[in-house]
Amino acid sequence: PKMSYGDVPLGNEFFMAANGLLTEQGVNPVDISVFEWEGMPAFFATSSKSQLPFDFFAAACYLMSRYEEYIPYAPDDLGRFTPEQSLAFTHNFLDLPLIDMWFDRFVAAWTDFFELPPFKPPVNTTELVVEIPQLYAYKYKTLFRSFFEGLYDFGRLKFTRTFDRLMVVLRFREDPLIGLIEHMEAFRSTAVSFRFFALYTALGVHDKSLSVFSKKHQQELKSLSDYAPTAPLASFESTQKSQTLNQDINRFSGLIHRPIKAIRQHKLVLRFPDTYRAFSSSGIKHDYSMQYPDSPGFRASTAHPFRFFDLGEEQQTPLTIHPICLSESHIRAQQYARKMRQLFIGYQSRLQKLNAPMLVALTNETFNNRSKNATFLATL
């Protein structure tokens, strides 16, 4: 099979017209006109001689590289790019794995052109990414920290939480977050896989990890890592200092006695390309942070893992990005069980049709023994 990609076809080969983005130097604002093609959005329109009426490669690169996040934007209070500023949100395709849908059409055109047998797609999988910003709600904290956190809750009129904390500290009750492994056993009999990302860093304004010096905390995290793949939740502080990121990674590696190859960014503070450059420089091979904190959908418009392309260096990196389409906060925001289930099943069926993986992010708070989580867990 012969294919060409450029301005004009060379002969009777499979021709894909280029719009020029992939040959440009640097990152510059791009004027994008979105149109409808076969019932889905497309952009970077090309000549009628092309097998697809748009530059599939340039459009996919624009979305997957997060080109628009290199352009100056108005950050939220944590310095994050907001979904409302994205092309996907503006043109109502944030909830679509658009690149995967395009690729499905591209493969169909390819096999039809060369009269090839149907392409055998990969098997659809579901994986839970369980974030652990704090292993326990009240256990293993110093009396000083317990006192001031309790005082803070009391000042905000959270009397139930204040009383619950007191009962746990006095050992009249178990911590509400105890028994994570027992809860995860329910998924062992299903086709769902899972992995943990635990915050294990110095206490900070946005990082509420239990003490890294607590022997019991260390033992619990080690037990988790023996049960399922476990990696660090990179601290918020590490987004400002690469030295802190390396300390977090080395500390976690020393704890579980394994090299660290995967990571997730706490608070999902991603700054392109700095965050992913720092991960790559620290030896990280897999990132699980590609999502928006407050909006469900596909931040990079794909559900499939992909190698991150650094636009600043104009090269592909060894870092593989694993996109997440839903998180606990997205599902809970629906409030009612029916709407929760509709949201979950909507994404699930969409990805099953494309044989694409589905990654859902939870926190260990999902399995809080004192919360009314039965409806939410039933959705999963």
For the regions a language model picked out, list residue spans one by one.
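Catalytic domains of cell-wall/extracellular-matrix polysaccharide-remodeling enzymes
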Residues: 1, 237-315, 369-373
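Terminal accessory/targeting
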Residues: 1-213, 303-304, 311-380
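Conserved hydrophobic/aromatic pocket- or pore-lining residues that grip, position, or stack substrates
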Residues: 131, 233, 279
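Metal-dependent polysaccharide deacetylase catalytic core of the NodB/CE4 family, i.e.
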Residues: 134, 138, 158-162, 185-270, ...
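Short acidic/histidine-rich active-site segments
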Residues: 232-233, 289-291, 360-365
